């Protein structure tokens, strides 16, 4: 599988190369809100080809109340969801014709969790386009803490009209 080692191997797209998005701009793209918006900022956006989002994990996260008392660990499924949110924001930001559309998470393949994510960690979600057949996109995604890979997965998503979603 394609491993994302650093920012130098991420190819630039035509419209959004070098862009960043703050949480307010992310909320204009994604329907997610607290406590389920799991990315704080897009720190690098290279068209639809790739991007990097940031999540600063704090002890105040609601999921730490039960996962696990006395030894808080961010659930792996939420790392995957944050990867999917990163990819979704990239697709929606890159294509102006996607206004009024939602990104639905379709698939997870090759998921691996390598190290726990704990309060105080800054998690960087790197995503890179593998395949595009609109309305379906596939991305390779990795989560990194302190420059080390903590999780990875191949994720698939589909764009649908917001009105069709019900």
Model-derived segments and their meaning:
Residues 42, 108-146:
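Hydrophobic beta-sheet segments that form the core/acyl-binding groove
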């Amino acid at each position: 599988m394609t491993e994302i080692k650093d920012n130098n191997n991420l190819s630039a797209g035509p419209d959004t190369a070098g862009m960043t998005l703050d949480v307010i701009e992310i909320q204009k793209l994604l329907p997610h809100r607290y406590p389920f918006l799991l990315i704080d900022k897009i720190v690098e956006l290279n068209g639809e080809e790739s991007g990097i989002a940031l999540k600063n994990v704090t002890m105040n996260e609601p999921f730490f109340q039960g996962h696990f008392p006395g030894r808080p660990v961010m659930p792996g499924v939420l790392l995957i969801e944050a990867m999917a949110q990163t990819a979704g924001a990239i697709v929606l930001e890159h294509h102006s014709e996607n206004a009024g559309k939602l990104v639905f998470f379709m698939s997870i393949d090759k998921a691996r969790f390598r190290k726990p994510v704990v309060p105080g960690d800054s998690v960087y979600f790197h995503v890179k386009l593998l395949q595009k057949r609109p309305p379906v996109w596939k991305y390779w995604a990795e989560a990194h803490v302190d420059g080390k890979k903590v999780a990875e997965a191949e994720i698939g998503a589909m764009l649908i009209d917001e009105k069709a979603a019900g």
